[in-house]
Amino acid sequence: MRVVIQRVSKASVTIEENVVGKVGPGFMLLVAFNDEDTDADLDFAVRKIVNMRIFEDEQAKMNLSINDVKGAILSVSQFTLFASTKKGNRPSFTKSGNPELASKLYDQFNAKLRATGIEVQTGQFGADMQVELVNDGPVTIVLDTQNKE
């Protein structure tokens, strides 16, 4: 599982000219799964995202979590995070998860995020989406549950 976490002042996702998800301050998450991901990977990612202290406190130090700032999350599936560019100029997506499994994991991931009490808006799995965001900082962190650094 890979998640690109972006601290945003606002973000939205549009499908066929309809805004389907929109948040103010918080996180924009781009989320991808592979066939080896498990419930433990979902739990690890949710725990890290919810507790990650990357919002500034009164001293301008990154010391606050999304809960502390009462932020919201916009979660968008993006299988291209598992692209391989090893050979040639056209990316390979064979490491991306089976769409049926990935869709199920995406729904479970968002449910686990919501269970923490944080507002979670989403895109639509597999849809062609337009994502708009205003990066705050910018602060962008890549979380990979297979490479826990």
Curated annotation (Swiss-Prot):
Q: List the keywords (alphabetical).
A: Cytoplasm, Hydrolase, RNA-binding, tRNA-binding
Q: What is its EC number?
A: 3.1.1.96
Asked if the keyword ATP-binding belongs to this entry, the reply reads: no
Q: What is its main location?
A: cytoplasm
Q: Where is this motif: Gly-cisPro motif, important for rejection of L-amino acids?
A: 137-138
SUPFAM superfamilies to which the protein is assigned, alphabetical: DTD-like
What subcellular compartments does it reside in? Cytoplasm
What terms describe the molecular function in GO for this protein? D-tyrosyl-tRNA(Tyr) deacylase activity; Gly-tRNA(Ala) deacylase activity; Ser(Gly)-tRNA(Ala) hydrolase activity; tRNA binding
**Alphabetical list of InterPro entries matching this protein:** Daa-tRNA_deacyls_DTD, DTD-like_sf
According to its UniProt record, this protein's enzyme class is hydrolase
Q: What is the documented function of this protein?
A: An aminoacyl-tRNA editing enzyme that deacylates mischarged D-aminoacyl-tRNAs. Also deacylates mischarged glycyl-tRNA(Ala), protecting cells against glycine mischarging by AlaRS. Acts via tRNA-based rather than protein-based catalysis; rejects L-amino acids rather than detecting D-amino acids in the active site. By recycling D-aminoacyl-tRNA to D-amino acids and free tRNA molecules, this enzyme counteracts the toxicity associated with the formation of D-aminoacyl-tRNA entities in vivo and helps enforce protein L-homochirality.
Domains (record comment): A Gly-cisPro motif from one monomer fits into the active site of the other monomer to allow specific chiral rejection of L-amino acids.
PANTHER family in alphabetical order: D-AMINOACYL-TRNA DEACYLASE 1 (PTHR10472:SF5), D-TYROSYL-TRNA TYR DEACYLASE (PTHR10472)
Q: Please give the subunit comment from the record.
A: Homodimer.
Listed name of the protein: D-aminoacyl-tRNA deacylase
Gene giving rise to this polypeptide = dtd
